[in-house]
């Protein structure tokens, strides 16, 4: 009985820490990052700002696909864009993405 009470307390703590709204935010972020093109773009933007054409070369994708992915991540609030002359430069905006990328590099980096 004591073990069941302990487990119920753990479950209550988890539910308090990650309510439905928090779970929705986590799901949204992981969904964005689960696409390989978006993930590579986010990893690049974590290091430096890039233009669409640079990200197109990096991701080996067509401009329409890169633009679509950038729009999705901009609308989600994870990246920002700024016009510099004729180019639009994208920058990582959300520090949580940066932290998550660092942790993923630590867990799944080349040396593993």
Functional labels for PLM-detected ranges:
Residues 74-84, 91:
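Beta-hairpin "wing" of winged helix-turn-helix
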Residues 69:
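Residues within the DNA-recognition helix of helix-turn-helix
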Residues 107:
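An amphipathic, aromatic/His-enriched active-site/gating alpha helix that lines ligand/cofactor pockets
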Residues 24-64, 88-95:
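N-terminal helix-turn-helix DNA-binding core of bacterial DNA-binding proteins
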Residues 103-104:
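Residue-level signal for well-ordered alpha-helical positions
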Residues 1-33:
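N-terminal leader segment of winged-helix/HTH proteins
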Residues 96-100:
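Short, charged/polar, Gly/Pro-enriched secondary-structure boundary elements
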């Amino acid at each position: 009985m004591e073990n069941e009470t302990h487990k119920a307390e753990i479950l209550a703590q988890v539910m308090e820490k990650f309510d439905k709204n928090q779970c929705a935010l986590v799901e949204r972020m992981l969904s964005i990052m689960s696409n390989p093109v978006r993930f590579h773009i986010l990893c690049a933007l974590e290091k430096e700002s890039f233009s669409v054409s640079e990200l197109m070369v990096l991701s080996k994708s067509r401009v329409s696909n890169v633009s679509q992915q950038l729009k999705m991540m901009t609308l989600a609030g994870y990246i920002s864009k700024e016009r510099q002359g004729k180019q639009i430069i994208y920058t990582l905006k959300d520090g949580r993405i940066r932290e998550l990328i660092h942790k993923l590099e630590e867990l799944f980096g080349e040396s593993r």
